[in-house]
A protein has these predicted regions:
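Alpha-helical transmembrane segments of multi-pass membrane transport and lipid-handling proteins
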Residues: 19, 84-109, 299-328, 337-351, ...
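Membrane-proximal transmembrane or re-entrant/amphipathic helices at the cytosolic face
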Residues: 446-508
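Membrane-interface helix-loop junctions in multi-pass transport and translocation proteins
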Residues: 152, 160-194, 367, 377-409, ...
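N-terminal membrane topogenesis motif
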Residues: 1-27, 118-123, 147, 200-201, ...
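Alpha-helical transmembrane segments of multi-pass membrane proteins
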Residues: 100, 113-141, 167, 318, ...
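Helix-loop junctions and terminal segments of transmembrane helices
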Residues: 60-75, 272-289, 302
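Signature of the first transmembrane helix
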Residues: 5-64, 166, 226-248
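Interhelical loop/hinge segments that connect adjacent transmembrane helices in multipass membrane
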Residues: 1-7, 197-235, 252, 291-292, ...
Length: 508
């Protein structure tokens, strides 16, 4: 048996798979935009997708919050059976909003957008119930594989599921219209589950029907799954709340806000999301429980994350309008870019959160994280109500940023106590350093892009990226080294996959 990979290698593999999976999601979004445009039907679809996303967030949280519960059991596979039974309970409960209450929920989500939007949302909710079941089961299987130090196969399975979803969407769109999106997600989710289940079977897992049958304790485990996800769940609930306010800005606004949030999620998953998934099993097994021992990993994760995030934000600022205008009109392209930039500060907050979140989950402080999440939903509702008065999606983006800032501060206080202020000072220093280097690289590129017009902006963005790499290597050698430790194994893995003989795969 090979030695366990380093955290950096596993983070890189996970980041690579998450980026690939999210990129496939971007392809789906692009197909929707090109095939169906930006109208009441797409608003209804994305309203339903927001609710489905709540269940996806619950599912994905299993990969960090439930790993410790699976790892501490004498038999990971027996524990997996029990939690699959709990997933069955959750799936049945999800039928209430997605099936039974589909019509009233669709009316609530689409505000005054009309009957066409309501019908699209209602039908999508019903179909996405099945896709949600696949997501719940798949994430639990991925958590079980993480306990075995298996990260490449789950990543590849999610990517394969995305490819299947795209193929199904393109094939079914002429027949089913906008509902081909929801059905495509169902088919892709089933493919993801099948691939991970096959890998577990190869590792010796034998599903036990008796072990999966929900009993009196299954309801308690289902509640634990939701409770453990409450902290991260709040982010998606806040998105659904904000989407409702976006609907008040008129037809097409929810679709644009969804695209902005999707881009934000793409960058988030490839940085903070990947690090959190990989940190969970390692920290659960090795952490000594002292807050002081978290300082070093927190700083390393934060430095690596900032070094990856800065060029992302810079490229969006310089080339975003030009790229977005390829599929949107110039006004919508500007709004989309500005909204993403308004949200982008949340990426900085997010790369500070993996270590505190995993530490709190390892301590079993699910209630505290849930309380922070609830605070975020309430705050987001209030800030969105104010922001919508400005008649601007960008204002809604800033509202999301302020909500994230408040939540991040509270989580640091919960993790480090009075030492949180020292931690904040250290993190603030790192932000200033990386921001200064980013400004040196991208501000000239931004001005040259403005002067040269949109045709020149992508070239200037590339120039800014090259300048950032050169400056970071010179002025921030430690940050650059950490970023390389994260990205290097991913590039090496890519080369090995490309050179692998036919029939070999990521899980081989």
């Amino acid at each position: 048996m090979s030695e366990p990979r380093s955290m950096a290698a596993n983070a890189a593999i996970t980041a690579l798979s998450q980026v690939a999976s999210m990129a496939l999601g971007a392809v789906i979004a692009l197909v929707i935009l090109l095939r169906f445009g930006k109208d009441a039907e797409t608003d209804g679809l994305f309203a339903a997708y927001g609710v489905y996303g709540v269940l996806v967030v619950v599912a994905q949280s299993f990969r960090t919050t439930i790993v410790a519960r699976l790892a501490e059991d004498r038999s990971t596979f027996a524990a997996l059976d029990r939690y699959l039974g709990a997933v069955g309970v959750l799936f049945a409960a999800a039928a209430i909003p997605l099936l039974v209450l589909a019509e009233p929920l669709a009316r609530l989500l689409t505000a005054d957008l009309g009957r066409e939007a309501v019908d699209a949302a209602r039908t999508s909710l019903m179909i996405l119930w099945f896709a949600a079941g696949a997501q719940l089961a798949g994430a639990l299987l991925a958590a079980a594989l993480a306990v075995r130090d298996e990260f490449a196969l789950p990543g590849a399975a999610y990517v394969a599921g995305g490819v299947v979803s795209i193929i199904a969407l393109i094939a079914l769109a002429p027949v089913l219209g906008i509902q081909a999106v929801a059905l495509g997600l169902c088919i892709g989710g089933a493919a993801t589950v099948a691939l991970m289940l096959l890998r577990l079977l190869r590792l010796g897992y034998r599903p036990s029907a008796v072990g999966m049958v929900p009993d009196r304790t299954a309801v308690g485990r289902a509640a634990l799954l939701v409770w453990a996800a409450a902290g991260t769940l709040s982010t998606q609930v806040a998105f659904v709340v904000t989407l409702g306010f976006a609907a008040q800005l008129g037809e097409g606004a929810p679709t644009l806000y969804t695209y902005a949030t999707f881009l934000f999620g793409l960058f988030l998953a490839s940085t903070a999301g990947a690090m959190t998934i990989v940190l969970a099993p390692r920290l659960a097994e090795t952490w000594d429980g002292r807050s002081e021992s978290l300082h070093a990993p927190l700083l390393e994760v934060f430095r690596a994350g900032l070094t990856l995030i800065a060029p992302i934000v810079g490229v969006i600022a310089v080339a975003g309008p030009a790229v977005a205008s390829l599929v949107l009109d110039s006004d919508d392209a500007r709004v989309l870019t500005d909204t993403v930039l308004a949200m982008s500060g949340g990426l900085v907050l997010a790369v500070a959160m993996p270590v505190p979140l995993v530490a709190l989950y390892t301590r079993g402080r699910y209630a505290a994280v849930a309380a922070v999440g609830l605070q975020g939903v309430v705050l987001q509702f209030g800030l969105s109500a104010i922001a919508v008065g400005f008649d601007s999606l960008v204002a809604l983006g800033f509202a999301s940023l302020l909500t994230g800032l408040a939540g991040a501060i509270v989580l640091l206080l919960l993790t480090f106590g009075r030492g949180a202020w020292r931690v904040l000072a250290l993190l603030g220093r790192e932000v200033l350093l990386v921001a200064a280097v980013g400004a040196l690289a991208f501000v000239p590129a931004l001005w040259l892009g403005v002067l040269g017009g949109r045709a020149l902006q992508p070239v200037m963005a590339l120039g800014g990226l090259v300048a950032f790499v050169a400056l970071a290597r010179w002025l921030l050698p430690r940050h650059w080294e950490l970023a390389q430790r994260v990205a290097g194994p991913a590039l090496g893995r890519l080369r090995r996959w490309r050179s692998a003989p036919a029939g070999a795969g990521p899980g081989a």
